[in-house]
Amino acid sequence: MRRLAFLVAVLTGALVFTSWAAGADKSKLEMYTATVDRATVGELVREGFDIAATREVAGGVSVDLVLSARARDRLSAQGVGLALKRNKDGLTVQEQAAAQAANGFTVYRSWDEPGGIRDELYEIAKKNPSFVKLEVIGHSVQGREIVALKVTKNANQLADGARPDVFYMATIHAREWISTEVNRRLLHHFVDNYKKDPVVTNLVDTRELWFVPVSNPDGYQYTFDVERLWRKNLRDNNGDGQTAIGDGVDLNRNYDEKWNYDNEGSSTEFASDTYRGPSAASEPETKAIQDLLKRLRFRFMVTYHSYGPLLLYMWGFQVQTPTADDPIYVAMSGTDANPAIPGFDPGVGADLYITNGTTDDYAHAVTNTLGWTPELEEGCVGCGFVFPDDEALVQAEFQKNLPFALDVAKSAPNPAQPVSHLGNTTKPFYLDLSAIDPEKVHNPLSDFRFAVSYGDPQPVQVLARRSLGAVTLKYQINGGPVQSGPTSEWNGGERFGDLGDVYYRIMRGSVTGTSPGDIVKVWFEGGGSASDPFTYTARVESSNRVLVLAAEDYTGISPVYKKTDGPNYLSYYVDALAANGISADVYDVDANARTAPSLLGVLSHYDAVIWYTGDDVLTRDPGMVAGTASRLANDEILAVRAYLNEGGRLLRTGKYAGLGEADGYEFNLETNAPCNPDDMGQDGCEPLQNDFMQYYLGAYVYNDDAGTTANGKLYDVVGTDTPFDSLAWSFGGPSANNQDHSASFIATSGILPASTYPQFRSWASAKYDRPGGPFDPHTGSFYAYSNIADITYKRLTRTINVPAGGANLSFWVSHDTEELWDHVFVEAHTVGQDDWTTLPDQNGHTSTSTGDSCPEGWRELHPFLDHYQTLNADNTCSPTGTTGSWNAASGNSGGWVQWSVDLSAYAGRQVEVSIAYVSDWSVQGLGTFVDDIVVSTGEGTTSFEAGTDGWTATGPPPGSGPNSNNFVRTTAGGFPEGAAITTEDTIYFGFGLEGIATPSARNAVMGRAMGYLLR
């Protein structure tokens, strides 16, 4: 995904997006279109908006969304230009649906109606007992049957799974009626043509074909009865006994594979149409399909969806991550130039957008079932999910998909050597999958060739058909005798994990006995077959543990360097390493024909890599225009990502390092030719993804120029945590003196808590020393910090004894919240009484404005707020509630401000006081910081230096869900914004180390970094 949109005036001016309310929004859903940039698409996905389809158009990306009226209004208020999606007759999607229903359906039938889909499945089984078996594999939330049909000769007598088997399923998303029809017609194609068509007859006699045309029967029926555009199942998320927007689980995010891997591929929010559910496989519909998959372990699966047109395959959890079985997927799916389903775009699912907990990923990873998701067409321009109720159009869509569906059945006996009506075949060995799919070029998971080697022994690898058995490495050095070596299967590394290596596997061996200058020819043999060869040159063979990856792009154009015959800043790195007793090798990208270092040939030989970028703003070749990048930028990311996956350690540094990923610059994936960002659909442009930055480098948000002063210089930096604690440095002086830009980052663990997402653990290890910084403690070293999280009600609470003469509470607060939506306030009640109210700040920092969250229904999240606010019949809000009144602050406080609260109303009594911070459904500022609390009686006075003096994080009141995090006592190191972010294996600087002012300071920073990375 792209940049998280924070409301932080001092750090970033990014656009902010907000998703819709949970709970009782009963407005009809409708479809809209908007043209946005690539970064905005990522924001929409992250915020859980229901994105139906995307298309590359002039000026950006056209996005189709399904929105409630409330969601539409909120998104429009954030500056996204929405237009109702209409067909050629000017009808909206809901109007089209209403017209279909009013006229009576010709094609479509519901689940429950007499003669509906359920009855039809029973009738098919009843009429064809010799080759059709019906099985109820589970029941839905509301008790409807989930019906599967097994089609094979002697179906009722033959044990399940006795023949090569294939699974066709549909309607996991309720509104996708065309998927139901295509699956139903495919079922009829086999049933109705058995003993009539020789191809069908042979398949039914020799294969086992399973069908579940409706895997979400509750949702499917609901689309007929209530809401045509409903997507999820009918789980009652808030337990109010009603079905409304905010209910339901996205069943295609509920499977027990990478479930809750992150908050991008699925959502934790009820209201999101990608809500993943309370736990993996929590839904009975999911359990039914999972149990079937585990029991039968199909050879193949096809799960029909709409709308695209797309033909997606594994994986969904991480971008540009093909499986080891990719030769099968490519052979059967085809390519952009020649797809297996005419007009469809085949490819890896995550390259559309990240998903996790999906049916296909579960099937492949857990049950060794290779799976596809055809995203069927919409039927007409502007029809969206309401495919026309037109027999000819529906049948045409089925016929278009039939050849691929038949290929899947035909290929079941030997998946490793599939049948394709395109004539595609697979080979025993692959060194380079880009030969069959240009989109796989230079990906370390699919392109294993390299030109130079930096070590001996030199690992080499090949993708080999598993049935070949033992694979032998063959190589020649300088044309000498052929030498042989064993190979072993690669385990996938630390992060990639399961390679999906059911029928193919990556085999590795080692070439030994080379010297610098040698030319080595490599190939592999096994099972009577041999791979193509490739040749590399041995260049470097040292015992150095560190590689300096010089990626200055001095032969590029952004900027144009004065010195273009070699690196400008390399000496600063080599010298700083030498000062710490470390010798290093160098890989100069420009000098290597602008080629990224190979994982195997170069990076694998080192324990740590220093990747620096000098003055490079964006890696861009001559002839490329603004808004675009060289494919080299993506190649470098993929190479370093693969290196980290195998246990490597990295320091990334540069004044613009990561800007291209953060801003989503486009590049040509296939040919590295210039591409036009305003016409991406015609020239192969793809965006640089920031997933590497977020999930490998621990930097969830890139804050552009956040460490730069008004006069263009950089603030000093102070170390706050491992490995830079107690270290400080400045810029300029006797250095490269080139630091005129900077970045800070929000640590990924500040957004995805390490307690839940330990794989992304990260922290701010150094910060810019901004004078009067609004997010450092007001005094001393400690303060209370709210942390960052949506849908939370956080309280810092203490009981105070108020004397007869009254008392006063004062404290300093610095807050940055989503303006008008998230609020900071002081609430109080007499101990033992329900007289709750909020108290105004006598210094004028609070107001009675209820903001935008109250009329948008945030009481559904936090019903306790009814004590202070009232939602009126006209959808306005009053700042009084059942027991008290509303006084709060929102937005950015502009730094530390002092609040003063009068407690005289509680004279002679005990009062429980809470400093509270409440957030809505989505979008976070940087949170709330509290320091230097003073109570006039002395009771509860604290600056948090030695403790909290009785102030505790008490959690939310009744009615709100549990907080994902709470107020904590911490140093500035507990706030996740930093000039440097550190993970277990990486350090990421928002500046170039070459610009640190003095050699001694550079040496100290380098020493700390290397001490950590080489530990």
Regions found by a protein language model. Give the residues of each.
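Helical hinge/lid and interdomain linker segments adjacent to catalytic or ligand-binding clefts
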Residues: 156, 491, 561-672, 908
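Metallocarboxypeptidase
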Residues: 224-226, 230-432, 706
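Extracellular ligand-binding/catalytic regions of CAZymes and related secreted enzymes
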Residues: 288, 395-413, 528-530, 540-545, ...
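Glycan-association/targeting regions that enable binding to alpha-glucans and other polysaccharides
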Residues: 412-549, 556-584, 795-802, 808-810, ...
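Extracellular glycan-recognition surfaces and repeat-rich motifs
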Residues: 490, 726-794, 819, 837-897, ...
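A glycine-rich, often tryptophan-bearing local segment used as a flexible ligand/cofactor-contacting loop or short
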Residues: 616-746
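Extracellular beta-strand-rich recognition modules
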Residues: 807-815, 824, 910-919, 944
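Extracellular carbohydrate recognition
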Residues: 821-823, 894, 919-937, 999-1003
